[in-house]
Amino acid sequence: MAGYSRTPLARKLGIKPGHAVAVLGLVPSTFEPRLELPEGVKVSHQLRPQPYDVIILFVDKLAELERRMSPVLARLHPDGGLWIAWPKKAARKPTDITEDVVRRIGLAGGLVDNKVAAIDDVWAGLRLVVRVENREAVAYRAEPPAPKRKPRPRTKSGAGAAAHRALSRPR
C-alpha cells in the first residue's frame, strides 16, 4: 500500500501485549492477518461480559452504528479505546457514515476522539476514549461481573407466609 505508514497496524490501533480485543461488524478478510498481534493478546469476535482494552467496530450504516454503540460502550474498559471504522469516500462503497458523524455520536456518548487512522485502502477509523474526568465514574466496567446468584429456595415461613396461610384456610 503506497503512501501508508510503515507502523504496524496493531501498534497504530494501540493494541499492546496482554490486551483483550474485540473485533466486530463488517470485518474485512484482510484485516486480522495484517494485525501482527503482540504476545498474549486475546481477540474476540463477539462481546463477552469482560471489559475490553480495544474494541474495533466496522460499520457502513449509521443505523448499525447507533444500534451497536450502547452495548459496545458497556464493555469498553475505562482506559480503553473504541475504534469506529467506516468505508472511505475513495473506496466508493455506499455509506452514510463520515468522520464527523462518528465524532458527534461519540461526543453524545460521553467520549472524545483522540486519533484518526487509515486502517487500509478501504477503511478509515476514529479512536474514541472515555473523557479523563469521567473514567473514575465508569471504573466499575473494569471489575469482573458478579457471579449469578442461585435463587433462594422458597420456605413456608417468613414475611408473607402467615398471610398466605390465613388466606388459604377454608372458611
Outline where the language-model segments fall.
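Flexible, glycine-/basic-rich loop-and-beta segments that form/coincide
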Residues: 9, 131-171
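Conserved beta-strand signature within the Rossmann-like core of class I S-adenosyl-L-methionine
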Residues: 76-88
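Short beta-alpha junction loops
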Residues: 86-91, 121
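Conserved class I S-adenosyl-L-methionine
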Residues: 13-27
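A short glycine-rich, Lys/Arg-flanked "PGG" loop and its adjoining helix->strand segment in the class I
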Residues: 66-78
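Short, charged/polar "capping" segments at the starts of alpha-helices
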Residues: 28-34, 92-94
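Conserved Class I S-adenosyl-L-methionine
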Residues: 96-117
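Short acidic low-complexity segments
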Residues: 41-52
